Structure formats: structure tokens, C-alpha cells
Amino acid sequence: MVADHQLLNMIKKFIFTITFCLFTQVSFAASDDSGSDSSNPQKDAQNFVKRGKKLESKGKNEKALKLYNKAYEKLLEANKADSRNPDILNYLGFTLRKAGKYEQAEKYYLQGLEIKPDHNGINEYLGELYVKTQRMDLAKERLAVLKDCNCEEYKELAEVINNN
């Protein structure tokens, strides 16, 4: 009788545990797929950009653009809180450039360079924008800024310039 009672309690605990696990899994599955689980819009945006770059490298440009647009929305939020952050301005420029909004992108890049003229990412991406908009002289100026950095940004911009 005592053994039956213990067995019954063990079965109840087992069922409770299984039920709890199932409900937990369902609630995670039902959460939105925004890719955002933090209250840090800059980090969220960086994650969207990273995922977008992976998709773009696989030729999935439309899906990548959707992620870049999500990143842009998060970056606007981050920029309201910290409008003098050159990294945020760089990512704003990047997402707009990827969307083909070159004038807007250039404005953000230039704002970032006012704050940090030697920002490697901004100099590279602004150079790429200049190549895309047929302003090779300005692209080469950005490359000259990166010349002594011994960084990937220099190599990547040099490659873009040489291929055009």
C-alpha cells in the first residue's frame, strides 16, 4: 500500500515535469522570430546585420534586405539614445546603403566621421558607397585614410576599388 502510494506520487511528479516541459517548449515556439531577446537595440541591430550578411553571401538578397530593414529600425531607436555613437551611425549608413538609399547613407557615414575620422568601418563602407555612386576619387581618399591601419577594411575597400 505504501509502495503504491509512492509509485502514484512518482507518476504524478513525472507527469507534472513532462507537462511543464511541453508548455515551456510551446511558449518558446510561440514567441516571435524577431531575433531580439534583449533590450539593447544596438546589439539587436548588429545581430540582424550579421544574419543579413550571411544570407547575402548565399545569394538570398531579398531575405537579407528584410533583416537590414529590421536592423535599421533598431538603429534608429539606438540613435535616439546615443546620437554621437560612430558605430551606430556606421550601421545606419550600412543598412541604408544596402537598401540603395545612398544619399541618406552618406549623411550617416559623414556624421560618424565628424565624431571619429579614423573609424575603419565607416571609411571602408563610405568608400564602397563612393565606388557604387561612381565617385572613385572620393573612394580612393577613404582608402588613403585606411592605408596604415593594417586592417581588413583596407584590403576589402582596395579590392572593391580594383574590381571597378
Task: Tell what function each PLM region has.
Residues 32-43, 54, 138-164:
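Terminal, low-structured helical/coil segments at or just beyond the last alpha-helical repeat
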Residues 85, 119, 151-154:
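Residue-level recognition of tetratricopeptide repeat
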